[in-house]
From Swiss-Prot:
This is Molybdenum cofactor guanylyltransferase. Coiled coil: none annotated. Belongs to the MobA family. Its EC number is 2.7.7.77. It comes from Shewanella baltica (strain OS155 / ATCC BAA-1091). The lineage of its organism: Bacteria, Pseudomonadati, Pseudomonadota, Gammaproteobacteria, Alteromonadales.
Amino acid sequence: MSSQIDAVILAGGMARRMGGDDKGLVELNGEAMIKHTIDRIKPQVKEILINANRNQTRYAEFGFKVISDEHTGFLGPLAGMITAMGQTDADYLLVVPCDCPLLPTDLVPRMLAAIKAEDAEIAVASDGEYEQPVVLLLKPSLRDSMKAFLEAGERKVDFWYAKHHFVVESFSDQPNAFVNVNTPEQKQRLAMEITK
Ligand SMILES: Nc1nc2c(ncn2[C@@H]2O[C@H](COP(=O)(O)OP(=O)(O)OP(=O)(O)O)[C@@H](O)[C@H]2O)c(=O)[nH]1
Ligand SMILES: [Mg+2]
């Protein structure tokens, strides 16, 4: 039987570098940033959860369930993952950020194959050089481990997965796949690239 995969799109941060504008909702080439991410991910998973801590009504307009961090206080991406892991019955949860509009269209099959080949618990994407700590495929049963880690005051996703059996899947064949839009300047630059 094939594995069921759900996804959470993380849009729960404060987006300080974007000047406080909600990063998932800023417009990139006529569409909300998160819509680009949704379009990349939707064909690859069963259900999508959108993790947001403000503008929840606006996020709901994309047609997916919106979930807010169960640990309040903007504790970082782990808080969004923990919440999503508690709300899925899938075999694996794909975690992606809302601000990577060019994610690979073959992200899930490659991450899943990497996990299965090594009987690992987690796959982490890499651009060939750097690991992408918020682009993960993981087993929802890891929730208790992640929750304990967060509640011990830890915040770094890569420190958490280092405690588990993880594999790195490289997407060096797709140099722009993890282009990350954190500032208005980066958004401008990407908009010009896309329309070229
Ligand atoms: N649920 C949740 N997600 C978060 C939180 N902080 C960051 N994220 C998400 O984690 C991903 C990576 O974080 P950043 O790129 O630093 O985003 P950010 O923290 O909103 O932006 P900055 O304030 O500029 O650092 C983004 O998809 C964020 O939405 C948080 O407190 N809760
Ligand atoms: Mg941040």
